[in-house]
């Protein structure tokens, strides 16, 4: 089932960030929400997920869906390792071989994933947060600036893993980078 925005508006004080926005995100579709900083892209994602209420309009089809997200601030548990962060978010059902494959796919070494995430670089943390969202049991995955701070090789590897892990789930990628849509094979909105 798709998620539909119908005439959604949102303001913060005097600043109108969304005005009469209507759009449909089909189940299994990859969409990049594009635009420069401050245009309301993250606010739109938060409204879709039910974390913010629109001032006007409605979101249809989101109720009952499971969401996973990697926002710009990673919100990882500092004292846990990369492995621990995935287990914490995804549950005990996440097995070692699947985790090892995921870490390798985005260029994290076995040594990297055993360290507390507080000791990892920004790019490494970004990849852990990305995996946490992708591996969670979710119908909709929201990735806010998912490749920010990654070098080109890491961007390519991470994007390939995102495409592989999408697997019928709706993907909303929030970005201002035009190349992200091409990397993900996503529709631009």
Model-inferred region functions:
Residues 144, 151:
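ABC-family nucleotide-binding domains
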Residues 130:
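Hydrophobic anchor residue at the start of the ABC signature
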Residues 79-94, 98:
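Q-loop/switch helix immediately C-terminal to the Walker
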Residues 49:
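Helix-to-loop junction immediately C-terminal to a conserved catalytic motif
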Residues 116-120, 124:
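Conserved ABC ATPase signature
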Residues 136:
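Conserved signature/switch motifs of ABC ATPase nucleotide-binding domains
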Residues 96-112:
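Conserved ABC ATPase "signature" region
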Residues 34-36:
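The feature captures the beta-strand-to-loop junction immediately N-terminal to the Walker
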């Amino acid at each position: 089932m798709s998620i539909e925005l119908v005439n959604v508006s949102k303001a913060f004080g005097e600043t109108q960030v969304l005005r009469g926005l209507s759009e449909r995100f089909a189940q299994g579709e990859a969409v990049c929400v594009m635009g420069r900083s401050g245009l309301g892209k993250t606010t739109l994602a938060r409204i879709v997920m039910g974390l913010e209420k629109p001032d006007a309009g409605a979101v249809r089809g989101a109720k009952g869906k499971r969401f996973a997200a990697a926002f710009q601030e990673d919100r990882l548990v500092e004292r846990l390792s990369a492995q621990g962060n995935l287990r914490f978010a995804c549950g005990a059902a996440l097995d070692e071989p699947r985790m090892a494959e995921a870490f390798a796919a985005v260029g994290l070494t076995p040594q990297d994933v055993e360290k507390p995430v507080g000791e990892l670089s920004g790019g490494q943390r970004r990849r852990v947060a990305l995996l946490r969202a992708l591996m969670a049991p979710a119908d909709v995955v929201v990735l806010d600036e998912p490749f920010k701070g990654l070098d080109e090789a890491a961007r390519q590897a991470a994007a390939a893993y995102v495409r592989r892990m999408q697997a019928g789930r709706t993907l909303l990628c929030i970005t201002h980078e035009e190349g992200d849509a091409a990397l993900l094979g996503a529709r631009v909105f």
